[in-house]
């Protein structure tokens, strides 16, 4: 029996219809966050896809010291709280240090551990203490079976509901590849698995002072992952990704999201037919 994580009226499981985790890479301000949330709530309601809003208050691992990091934790959580109350949608956002976990848990339903920090024991323990769902992005440097150690840490710290996310593996310099076997291997740990279709096309540091990406492959990888069978699809979106403050080359254009989701629903249905 595959593990199912319950969040309000949403059920997240590898054998269930996929949940969509989406939003802009970073919080750019209240008006932009509300604009994006409204569009995404309407679209996912129309397509009957369970929806969790994602955006980050701080991009703490920017390539360059000059990279825009975000609005900060205080303002960011205030904006996410507004999104949550106005649109009645669950929230996931990143935490980068133990000191951020308690405050973030007052707003977010899911605490996300960034890939670079997935083995940081103190951070995992601090996230666990909040009692929230903990979503860990598999490090680009880790084998999928190594996530068993992350799972053991979290369960030792008392976490009942864990989500793992595949976001590509390092393949030489400035490049990632997606090994679709990772999805099945992590699912064998009896943890719901999410595929991050946009960060998987990153070219880390590929633009010298910032990260590049190959947006044209997002749909292809999303289809492949959905064909394997996943609990959730993670895609960052923006109305104008080429002018976004971070991860623009990877993010999907908002106007293109509906057509992709319609296709993914078909793949998902076929994959999970009994």
Curated annotation (Swiss-Prot):
GO terms for cellular component: cytoplasm. Pathway: Carbohydrate biosynthesis; 3-deoxy-D-manno-octulosonate biosynthesis; 3-deoxy-D-manno-octulosonate from D-ribulose 5-phosphate: step 2/3; Bacterial outer membrane biogenesis; lipopolysaccharide biosynthesis. It comes from Rickettsia rickettsii (strain Sheila Smith). It is an enzyme of class 2 (transferase). Belongs to the KdsA family. It is found in: Cytoplasm. Its EC number is 2.5.1.55. This is 2-dehydro-3-deoxyphosphooctonate aldolase. HAMAP family: KDO8P_synth (MF_00056). InterPro entries: Aldolase_TIM, DAHP1/KDSA, KDO8P_synthase. It catalyses: D-arabinose 5-phosphate + phosphoenolpyruvate + H2O = 3-deoxy-alpha-D-manno-2-octulosonate-8-phosphate + phosphate. One of its GO terms (biological process) is keto-3-deoxy-D-manno-octulosonic acid biosynthetic process. One of its GO terms (molecular function) is 3-deoxy-8-phosphooctulonate synthase activity. The gene is kdsA. Keywords: Cytoplasm, Lipopolysaccharide biosynthesis, Transferase. Its main location: cytoplasm. SUPFAM superfamilies: Aldolase.
